């Protein structure tokens, strides 16, 4: 990748109902001024301005980075994120518009006569615009589909989503929110590349996917944070916590419009940097007592969740201890071993003082020292078995998806408002990195999740960047009441009847006290891409309640 560190690709959505508005065509809108590029303050200027507050701790850490990566400052520049060009569609083009202010104004009495809002949360600034997508127009799937935007009117943020109803039993099957990672990669990548109802071939044509996860669940694919995929804003989001408020608002307004889906079980799934997103997003939902989001579990695939436990396993995975031949020579492996103690010390400082001033140096040093040697080989960081080809994200199919999603008739059918689509926005990737989000200990939220819902961590075992060794390690190290019994639980075979009608072992699983870890054989970072049948098998089993203890 042509950035400081590897961007994690995801790697890594429904009928009429209440609060439906009768829409009238507005007068012709006035021309919108050309959006101005958004200049994000140089994070290193911010460091210098306030460094004295953390001099003893952060000063030593930063000196360490400068000693070991002396050219790092010359490679850093203030970030200028160009505002996306867009054309706002008139309200008359949308099938439904749900106003957060209408929902926030609803009060009810509880059993004791105490009045409270029907739905918790600050929703007044949000609207949800929804378009019914004609399935015959794009030929992606025959099921009912909706697309649209969540508008944060107070902050000029507009998040795009695309919903597909279940192919099986829409009013009985669960609903899943799918999130790709990056940070900065579109969830439509996961939709077309991994687990959605269709893939895009070299002729830029949609092909039916028999192993789509909407075989037995309805799915919302969400482009977040803002300025990812079809989403847009004049503002920037640079941390996971800020993004959580928007996701809660979208789900709340979506299930308000489509009550028939709100009664179903709801799950959040994602991969890669979604290992950061999902613990925060799930915690935000569970924080509210009065909600219409029936959250039942979360699924994280090949995620980055606990860097302190995961970073020690870059060297083993690259050097032949992860089940595949070594990618690096002995000198490079030794160099990674030598760098590890300093890296872990820096991550520990980030965990102790969660700030840009401690977390950013850890990201810079550790990613250069432990990911950099592998990156220089030209091997695919998402699959140790292959070389990186096609583009910076190593898969030529991603170019097909981008070309398809930039077709005017596709954008028109979906009600898209931006002028163009890109699969990953590396400015967002760097923005999250420069604000210290990368190394923060979001795994600390998982124990409180486990007290209420099951958590699945799965990992394709050929991935380097968020490898199965590190994911297994952090789940076994997690401090929660079931820690000891989970850590000592044996790995057991995962089996399925394959396409030849034979019983096949496709992975291993261990589970206790609501926490489950799966290793999926012969799959890389994007597990459903490499192992579509096995992925659908374990997803269906999980969503049906297998391994759940709450």
Curated annotation (Swiss-Prot):
Which UniProt key words apply to this protein?
Answer: Carboxypeptidase, Disulfide bond, Glycoprotein, Hydrolase, Protease, Signal, Vacuole, Zymogen
- Single Gene Ontology MF annotation: serine-type carboxypeptidase activity
* Protein's cellular compartments: Vacuole
Extract the InterPro entries matched here: AB_hydrolase_fold (IPR029058), Peptidase_S10 (IPR001563), Propeptide_carboxypepY (IPR008442), Ser_caboxypep_ser_AS (IPR018202)
* EC numbers on record: 3.4.16.5
Residue ranges, annotated region (Disordered): 20-39
Query: What is the name of the gene encoding this protein?
Result: CPYA
Which sites does the entry annotate for glycosylation? 203, 216, 289, 387, 493, 514
The UniProt entry's GO CC annotations, sorted and at most eight, read: fungal-type vacuole
Q: What exactly does this protein do? A: Vacuolar carboxypeptidase involved in degradation of small peptides. Digests preferentially peptides containing an aliphatic or hydrophobic residue in P1' position, as well as methionine, leucine or phenylalanine in P1 position of ester substrate.
Q: Which cysteines are joined by disulfide bonds?
A: 185-424, 319-333, 343-366, 350-359, 388-394
Query: What catalytic activity is recorded?
Result: Release of a C-terminal amino acid with broad specificity
Stated family:
Belongs to the peptidase S10 family.
Know the name of this protein? Carboxypeptidase Y homolog A
Q: Where is the active site?
A: 272, 463, 525
- Sequence intervals crossing the membrane: none
Signal peptide segment: 1-18
The biological processes this protein is annotated with in GO are:
proteolysis
Q: Which EC class heads this enzyme's classification?
A: hydrolase
Report the domain of life of the source organism. Eukaryota
The pro-peptide lies at: 19-131
> Which PROSITE patterns would you find in this protein's record?
CARBOXYPEPT_SER_SER (PS00131)
